[in-house]
Amino acid sequence: MPQLNSGGGDELGANDELIRFKDEGEQEEKSPGEGSAEGDLADVKSSLVNESENHSSDSDSEVERRPPPRETFEKPRDYLSEAFRRQQDAAFFKGPPYAGYPFLMIPDLGGHYLPNGALSPSARTYLQMKWPLLDSPSTAGLKDARSPSPAHLSNKVPVVQHPHHMHPLTPLITYSNEHFSPGTPPGHLSPEIDPKTGIPRPPHPSELSPYYPLSPGAVGQIPHPLGWLVPQQGQPMYSIPPGGFRHPYPALAMNASMSSLVSSRFSPHMVPPPHHGLHTSGIPHPAIVSPIVKQEPSSGNISPNLITKPSVVVKKEEEKKPHIKKPLNAFMLYMKEMRAKVVAECTLKESAAINQILGRRWHSLSREEQAKYYELARKERQLHSQLYPTWSARDNYGKRKKRKRDKQSPEMEITKTKKMCVQHLPADKSCDSPASSHGSMLDSPATPSAALASPAAPAATHSEQAQPLSLTTKPEARAQLSLSHSAAFLASKSPPSSSLSGSLSSPVGSPLLSRPIPLTSSILSPPCVFPSALQALPLLQAQPLSLVTKSSD
């Protein structure tokens, strides 16, 4: 695009600007301060054409610097036109839902010029929306070079800094210090905007967690679907008026990277989650979410009841049945008849003592006297069989056994089994004792034992140990074991000076028969062994051993 000079570029620049805004559906607002200093406007617009060619690349791949400082005689309208031109070239209007109103910027046309070449408030609002992420850690150098303090409106461009509890990716929408009434929004708003409040209606309220924008004047909490694009508390540039007003435009400020989020209709995984520092965040409390009812405890409670119910029913049926006593025998009939007499004669009232007295008297009776009671008992049995034909003595005895089983708690059964295990432990200890004795002999070889001096003692212990577990597999292995026994025998017959070597070589055979682990220790541990024992050891190492439960020959 050719450069325009200050003379004839005024008309062309103005027509080009009007055509571009008509394409985007934006109506340029006319203000009373527009008709001043035509020559200055021409110079500014010619410089804007040059800057638009330099900055026409994507705003995502490069960090745009602040515009060069202007002279103090420039007017706020110049920066307004610069803002619209740079916005259009940097692809601000990519978002399809809110293409007509990408951001809010109310120019402060009545403001005075600031000293030392500072920018007007409208330029500050443009810069703040043009670079919403200047407060990120990667731009610390820009912070240091541009603003010593975020809220101080000096001759430097103020950089936005959020409070510590706000999300770093939250672009802020700024307002000018002009108060305006909460009028109705224009008629060309998109259908998704509420005409009463001017705030976009939530398209997917169940998917998006809203923020609640609060003004210093305690504006009512209004849910917003785009919570990360709504102005939050602690905004350092321009605060919302304390009267509390409704904004007629949707609160959006998008660069090229954010327009892709708008085009994708704000899928839940792309929207940053609200930070927990805000007390008005829309994260649902865990108690509000309906929990999944776990039915495992209830099913666990039902199954024992179902199991125990039949047994309870059976017990109740048994209790309903009357207890049928067995027919009395001859002795019981005698006791029934004579018990009152014995109680009257004796001062004892214990039933055991009375029963002993009745038993002695029963045995002292003659056969004829006893026969009388046996006859009565026979008649009693006949009468009982007629009354209860299906009765059996097993019913009563079975009930007693069941009662005993119910009375016995499972703890008693556990203690019984433990006692049985303890009774078997001494036998196991007797099997383990030879290995421990051999281990002690190998650990302390300086004390020769008298039992190893006699050749018969090891053989007896070997035969006893070989019965539960014998490591014999083939006749060849048995022959090799006999060689080891002979080596131990020769070592025991050696003179007293070689008693130490005998005590070390003799345990070679016994661990072989008891356990395989002492075999390696006994082979490796003795430093000096009799030559015959050394000849037998390679044979034992070459032959593999296996566990056999059969008794040895």
Curated annotation (Swiss-Prot):
Q: SMART domains of this UniProt entry?
A: HMG (SM00398)
* Chain positions covered by the region annotation Interaction with CTBP: 408-553
Q: Where is the composition biased (Low complexity)?
A: 444-463
Give the primary localization class: nucleus
Residues the UniProt record assigns to the DNA-binding region sit at: 324-392
Q: Tell me which Gene Ontology terms the entry assigns under biological process.
A: Wnt signaling pathway
Q: Ranges of Basic and acidic residues compositional bias? A: 17-32, 52-77, 407-416
- InterPro entries the UniProt entry points to: Catenin-bd_sf, CTNNB1-bd_N, HMG_box_dom, HMG_box_dom_sf, TCF/LEF
Q: Which UniProt keywords apply?
A: Activator, Developmental protein, DNA-binding, Nucleus, Repressor, Transcription, Transcription regulation, Wnt signaling pathway
- Polar residues bias located where? 464-473
Q: Where is this region: Disordered?
A: 1-77, 183-213, 392-474
- The segment annotated Interaction with CTNNB1 runs over 1-61
Domain of life, per the record?
Answer: Eukaryota
Q: Gly residues composition bias: which ranges?
A: 1-11
Q: How is it modified after translation?
A: Phosphorylated. Phosphorylation by csnk1e promotes binding to ctnnb1 while phosphorylation by gsk3b may reverse this effect.
Can you name this protein? Answer: Transcription factor 7-like 1
Organism from which the protein derives: Xenopus tropicalis
The opening ranks of the lineage are: Eukaryota, Metazoa, Chordata, Craniata, Vertebrata
Gene name tied to this protein: tcf7l1
